[in-house]
Amino acid sequence: MGSARLRLGAEGERAAKAFLLANGYRILRENYSTPLGEIDLIALEGDVVVFVEVKARASREFGPPQSSVTLTKQRQIVKAAGLYLQREGLAEAACRFDVVAVTFEGERAERPQVLLIRDAFGTGGTAIF
């Protein structure tokens, strides 16, 4: 992965984290990695554990950022989330899967557009977008 792409991803995650914090989420983990996959952010909203996939793009030329959360990626996140819940003794906790789409485009590049998609997919990995 090129350095510009890594930079875009890191900026997207920073913007997503700031957005979530400003909207009452409490960040528990960042870049949680398991043999089953990685989860960008794990947060609490109230008493719900929220697993967040962050997607960032420099433009909408190839579609909105959330369109790149494939079924395969969703399944990886669900598996990694299950492992997290098990490891943390939270197997009975309410949880959901959100996507934060961040677009750095044109004059707004310094102030990206952030879109939160709550309940973006379920444990079966079925996208709603």
Language-model features and meaning:
Residues M1-E30:
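Acidic-basic catalytic patches of nuclease active cores, encompassing PD-(D/E)XK
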Residues L20, I39-R60, P65, I77:
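Conserved catalytic cores of phosphodiester-cleaving nucleases, focusing on short active-site segments
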Residues R26, V49, A94:
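Hydrophobic "anchor" residues on beta-strands that sit immediately upstream
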Residues E30-S33, V102-T103:
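Short, solvent-exposed loop/turn elements at beta->coil junctions and helix N-caps
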Residues P35-G37:
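Short acidic/glycine-enriched loop/turn segments that link adjacent beta-strands
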Residues A56-E105:
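Catalytic cores of nucleic-acid endonucleases
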Residues R87-F129:
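Domain-level recognition of nuclease-like catalytic cores that cleave nucleotide substrates
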